[in-house]
Amino acid sequence: MNGRIHQNKSGSGPCLLGAAPTYVGLSSPYFFSLCLTSANPPYQVMDGGSKASATPVYNYFVEQAKELKPAYVSMIIPARWYSGGRGLDSFRESMLHDHRIRQLFDYSDSNDCFSGVDIAGGICYFLWDEKHDGNCKVVNFHNGAKYETLRQLDDNDVFVRYGQALSILNKVQQQTTEFYDSRVSSQKPFGLRTYVVPTEDGDIQLRYNKGIGPFKRRMVTSSLDWIDKWKVIMSYLTYDHAGRADKDGKRRIFSTMEVLPPEVVCTETYIVIDTFDSKAEANNLLQYLKTKFVRFLVAQVTTTQHISKANFTLVPVQDFSKPWTDAELYAKYGLTVEEIAFIEAMIKPME
């Protein structure tokens, strides 16, 4: 662990945070109480794949630090745990429901904390106080601005990164009966891995990472009823490098999106957002996904480079017999001038 453990001899008074660390062997005749565990632990171990597929280990250091029963724990770790996944689900639940976390400092761009270092999803550090049981002060640093809120980390079913977004989300939830995480496909929507390529001939077509080509219907193993539908698909990778905003502090979120006609399927390079009987409805959904409103909602729960159905848990399903614009969506959910400005400041236009 790249950090410090501060200890004090029992009966010698309160520990001095920042004092020189004392390391005690098992043969020590003194009883020591642990006061503060602070660290910048290792973040991940490589599993033979890319960095994006490496296995996180920082969660184990946090959990072990708490097991030592210190008065305080403070660590700086990747912010990817906000949305769970990749072995982080139980850690996420533990952190969000732990009301002893007194402060959480969040950097959506890791460069603002570690110059020249790209960490997908950003970075955060926290103060865990063994005697604290209440709200957490959440401080967000974004594009040179600082936002501070006092709240419970488990106030919502999902962890919302920016406190300023909570009022927007509450308004959306009050008027919504179905969210898009109930419709978006899982990975491998048609059971076809990324390495699957078109065949020499076929009765349908395959959209893969290098284009489109002939394919055999009998090779499709999942979602057979979607083959003859109009489909809206999206790349499973986000557009923003390491989750970083552009020079103006704005994010695009989505990368490749398109409408696939009947008799066209795709590999797991893409996920299916929804299917329709008509081309018009599919095009209206595509336009909806391009709105700043939708991409802002997705951004609240996107701290990795991957897009899945879980990222659409805040996106309301609409009537797609008509197209939707940002102005119409802002009006439908009664957003204030300040709330609209917050969205516009975070999300870039998308044609």
Language-model-derived ranges and their functions:
Residues 46, 82-83, 241-243, 350:
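Flexible loop/turn segments at secondary-structure boundaries
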Residues 1-17, 27-192:
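Signature of N6-adenine DNA methyltransferases within the class I
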Residues 110-337:
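C-terminal substrate-recognition regions of SAM-dependent nucleic acid methyltransferases
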Residues 343-351:
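Short, amphipathic C-terminal "tail helix"
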